[in-house]
């Protein structure tokens, strides 16, 4: 059965990436949401997904796991998900891959939590600040170099590079991170995207029994 398996919308940053790609590509697949228990202990996901993680997409005979692989699959169906220009596309792939593989300090210190609103951490380590500075620089450089035709990193179209950074937009919002003017304008633009608003709306409908103390109590 075709489906997109995702975790708790409130917390699952990788699920958000896969979901955005699937929706942007116009794939007609239902969401199957599994409440996360944290720490890789969600047995229902292990029973379904080949790598025991979300997102996991089943579509017309294809079975795809890992967010970036799902994004690439969606781009084969909807090529607009990558910039048309060769140079811009190369840079978009580079920053998307950097986001997929890097920024570990930020991920650990500021896990995605859509229920947290502009509440900074009591302490922010130098490694986290370095990650924030690098992301700010990526956003500014791509906007200045490729963003003349629209509000996103590579212009008018919301592409995979934007999708990969979408959970970071949520993190920066939740933890009240201060950004440069260009990066701040981009953060607000992505936050206002209709699909981001829809994800937030659906997250707000999840039962409170799905909330995890390890994220809710983070200071």
Predicted regions and their residues:
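Short Asp/Glu-rich motifs
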Residues: 41-42, 191, 209-210
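GST-like domain detector, emphasizing the conserved glutathione-binding G-site
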Residues: 1-125, 129
